[in-house]
Amino acid sequence: MNVRELIEASAAQLEAAGLTFENGFGQGTTNAFDEAAWLVMWRLGLPLDDLDSVSNRPVARTELAEVATLLGARISTRKPAAYLTKEAWLMGVPFYVDERVIIPRSFIAELLVDESIDPWLSEDTKRVLDLCTGNGSLAVLAAMTYPDLAVDAADISLDALAVARINVDKHGLGDRITLIESDGLAACRGSYCLILCNPPYVNAASMAGLPAEFRAEPGLALSGNMHGGSDGMDFIRGLFLTVAAQMNENTVLVLEIGNERAHFERAFPHLQPFWFDTSAGSDQVLLLTREQLV
């Protein structure tokens, strides 16, 4: 059996176990083949982004056993693949992850890399805040994208910040990124030129129906109902009360809301944000100016 054949057989096992995009994927992959390729290539120590060059490589019997063990764990525990491998990739950049953080998949990453945010920046842009940083992936990508800017990365979770520290150090950005323990903006100081935020925003009904893989992630980072609401907008309501005070005249807030556009528009009918185009459509990430938030 070669690598491609092993991946195809593994994908068939995942499908037979009932894993689908709606029930098991969506945390780095969207289908059984890609999920199987991730697990197989990682277990064999092969480059995850170059299947074609190794697809005909024979797989030893011992390697088959190792892959079988990993695949069995994925199916039996319903743990996300990233928690099993302790690694996730975002825009081609590797990040350490474990159960202390959600698995990075923010569409803001696309906007950083493809320069979609750049028209709102200027030579006066100096400071960036990544609010609700989680494992620090957006802060790292922002620091890579804008090498002349200082980046603050804030999160309420000390566990998440510990993982973010691993990733900041992994990419040699300790002198560029400052990690801050903060409940929202409470411990953030001064004004920022660009604020990125991928907050908890999942509504109560969606939280109740999450597949096991998503329930394995920290609920604090997913549920937007921490103050008793049900529409997923609790954190965002609090953010909008205070964020303008830490924005300059030309600062913009780039906010991710996942599949919650309908809830967002009902909660904030007076706002007219700019909606970015992403690989998932134009309902995922929005931009607001300070003028809109005062």
Model-derived features: positions:
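N-terminal auxiliary segments of SAM/dcSAM-dependent transferases
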Residues: 1-90
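A general structural signal for well-ordered alpha-helical segments in protein cores
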Residues: 7, 36, 67-68, 139, ...
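Short amphipathic alpha-helical interface segments enriched in basic and hydrophobic/aromatic residues
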Residues: 11, 15, 44, 140-141, ...
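Alpha-helix termini
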Residues: 17-24, 115-123, 172, 247
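Short, conserved glycine- and acidic-residue-centered signature motifs
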Residues: 32, 101, 232
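SAM-dependent Rossmann-like transferase core, predominantly class I methyltransferases
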Residues: 54-61, 65-148, 156-163, 181, ...
